[in-house]
């Protein structure tokens, strides 16, 4: 997704 997850900024991994 493009929300920013807890793993990457701008790319959630979940």
From Swiss-Prot:
Domain of life: Eukaryota
Protein name from the UniProt record: Unknown protein 21 from 2D-PAGE
Highest classification ranks of the organism: Eukaryota, Metazoa, Ecdysozoa, Arthropoda, Hexapoda
